[in-house]
Amino acid sequence: MTSNENDLNSGEEVLTFGFSTLAQRYEDIVLPEAKPFQEILIVVQNPTDLSINLHSEREDIRVVELKSLGVAKSRNVAISQARGRYMIFADDDVTFKKDGLIEALEYFEANPDCTLILGKTVDEHGHPRKRYPVKHERLTRYNSARAGTIEMMIRVEAIRSAGITFDENFGAGAENFLGDEYIFISDLVKKGLRADYLPIVLAEHPAISSGNVWETERDLKVRAQVFKRVFGKWAFFIRIALVIRQIPRGLSISRALFFIKG
């Protein structure tokens, strides 16, 4: 595959945009421009049976309605339903960057053992939404805790064959409201699959902060559970290492001890 977009125009669905949204935000989705090599799969969480029109005039769009809530559940449906060779996860307020997507697809084609790519996102002003590494990195349990779903592109069949799914006990809409992306990457790596970070911009997303995950006891409890899920019996020591980094940034001793105890 070359960088020329026309090389993708083969009639095969190469890329799936896997959107996850709530019913009340369904009509707010920023849809990518129609292309012959892509499909747009929209998973709508509609537990209250909100009356919405799920029909689309575009042939490249498919909509799946869920009568349940939870972003991890909707991502798993997207994995099971995707027709593309690759899939990038999407939220309703994301705008994708064509050049970055093509570069990621080229990387997948050149590296057939790569199962997941983690890229970058920028805000509406073009500024990086977080601190990103400047060079390519192989992902591990130790460097992927800050991954975001909309930064992730997967090789669909490899993920399905390995039986990797998002843990539905974590993520927005679940009691443990964060960490689903980190757990997904960790499970992938534990199974011996390859995941790479690339310093390429995949999408634009508004610079909306969900708050400091060290702020409340609930935040600390959930974050502790994430590390327990990823590291098992070694989570206690990982939490100590994290606290050592966070105390100089303002984490109180009492909250540090609460987090360490899990």
Where does each model-flagged region fall?
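Short aromatic/hydrophobic "clamp" motif used to bind/position activated sugar donors
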Residues: 87
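Active-site donor/metal-binding and catalytic loop motifs
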Residues: 172-176, 194-214, 223-226
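Catalytic core of nucleotide-sugar-dependent glycosyltransferases
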Residues: 212-237, 259-262
